[in-house]
């Protein structure tokens, strides 16, 4: 199937699985058919508020169905979502707003900015707005994430990838029309990317308001999750549960557990490999800027402990010494 604009992906899956759950937030669910209609109406509301193609739209919403609806409504207008934490202090939020100069801020009180339109959490589009599909538009940039970086001041990391995706493209071991759990904050790049690609692939995506170790296991069992995104801190908290609690859930549907974003202690990784199986555990090393990516599966890691894997896609890895010279394999640089 050809690459599809983000403005068309929900329509594509809604036509094929309208009654299947698209997003589950701690038991509250929305189907693909509902997701399509609600984002069409919301996109028209954002358009009435002034959003144009290739604008940035700041999304300051907590984890929830509303977060996804806002992002896809923005994509349906050919604009670019810019997620930020809903809990940012006003001073930090205003710095990011000044940096990105969005045409709309979603999740801020009405009138919060002198020259930028804003709508609060819980904003509902008018009943007069149509739920019919909109014209196809493709934003020049898929996403614009924020980071404090090493300077302590916010910076905007604008993706060079257009807002389009091949829904048949195998990626990150995410099964087409599977079920994925993302228990991390969606304004972070990792959870955002994993959750969105899962939706692009037609998966049911489960999210939680915040991470809770046993709730994660409950959700894995309840929704027969195939793939889950984690960071080592989450893994450590799950391992700290009483053994009878940790092993008391049916996780037989789980095919892939990704961990990334921080170094994982070898002992913890070994525990998860022994518990879930080496071929289930995957590690990824990358950055929001997208300069390159490495991946390694658990069975490969067992023979190369400490490795973060081989480069993938067009990435090349080079280790250099203090003078900038290329070092041979096995040397520390």
PLM segments and residue spans:
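Conserved AMP-binding/adenylate-forming core of the ANL superfamily
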Residues: 2, 11, 19-64, 68, ...
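Conserved pre-ATP/AMP-binding loop-to-beta segment of ANL
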Residues: 3-4, 19, 123-146, 153, ...
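Conserved AMP-binding A3 loop
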Residues: 31-33, 135, 139-166
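Structural core segment of the AMP-binding/adenylate-forming
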Residues: 44, 48-49, 69-72, 76-137
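A short helix-loop-beta submotif of the ANL/AMP-binding
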Residues: 56, 62-82, 86-90, 100-101, ...
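Conserved AMP-binding/adenylation subdomain of ANL enzymes
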Residues: 165-179, 187-227, 241
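AMP-binding/adenylate-forming core of the ANL superfamily
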Residues: 318, 329-333
């Amino acid at each position: 199937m050809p690459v599809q604009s983000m403005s068309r992906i929900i329509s594509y899956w809604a036509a094929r699985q309208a009654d299947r759950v698209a997003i589950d937030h701690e038991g509250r669910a929305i189907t693909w058919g509902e997701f399509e209609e609600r984002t069409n109406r919301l996109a028209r509301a954002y358009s009435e508020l002034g959003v144009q193609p290739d604008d940035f739209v700041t999304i300051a919403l907590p984890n929830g169905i509303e977060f996804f609806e806002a992002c896809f409504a923005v994509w349906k207008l050919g604009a670019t979502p810019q997620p930020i934490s809903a809990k940012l202090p006003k001073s930090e939020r205003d710095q990011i707003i000044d940096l990105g100069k969005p045409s709309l801020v979603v999740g801020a009180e009405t009138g919060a900015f002198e020259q930028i339109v804003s709508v609060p959490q819980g904003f509902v589009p008018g009943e007069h707005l149509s739920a019919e599909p909109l014209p196809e538009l493709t934003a020049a940039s898929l996403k614009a994430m924020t980071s404090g970086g090493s300077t302590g001041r916010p910076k905007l990391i604008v993706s060079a990838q257009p807002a389009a995706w091949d829904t048949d493209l195998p990626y990150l071991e995410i099964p087409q029309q599977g079920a994925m759990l993302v228990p991390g904050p969606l304004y972070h790049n990792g959870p955002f990317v994993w959750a969105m690609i899962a939706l692009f692939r037609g998966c049911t995506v489960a999210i939680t308001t915040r991470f809770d170790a046993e709730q994660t296991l409950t959700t894995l069992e309840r929704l027969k999750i195939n793939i889950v995104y984690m960071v080592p801190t989450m893994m450590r908290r799950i391992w700290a549960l009483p053994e009878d609690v940790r092993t008391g859930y049916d996780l037989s549907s789980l095919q892939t557990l990704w961990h990334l974003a921080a170094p994982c202690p070898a002992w913890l990784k070994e525990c998860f490999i022994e518990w879930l199986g080496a071929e289930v555990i995957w590690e990824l090393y990358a950055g929001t800027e997208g300069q390159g990516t490495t991946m390694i599966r658990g069975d490969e890691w067992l023979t190369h402990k400490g490795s973060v894997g081989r480069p993938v896609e067009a990435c090349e890895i080079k280790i250099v010494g203090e003078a900038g010279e290329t070092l041979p394999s096995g040397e520390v640089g």
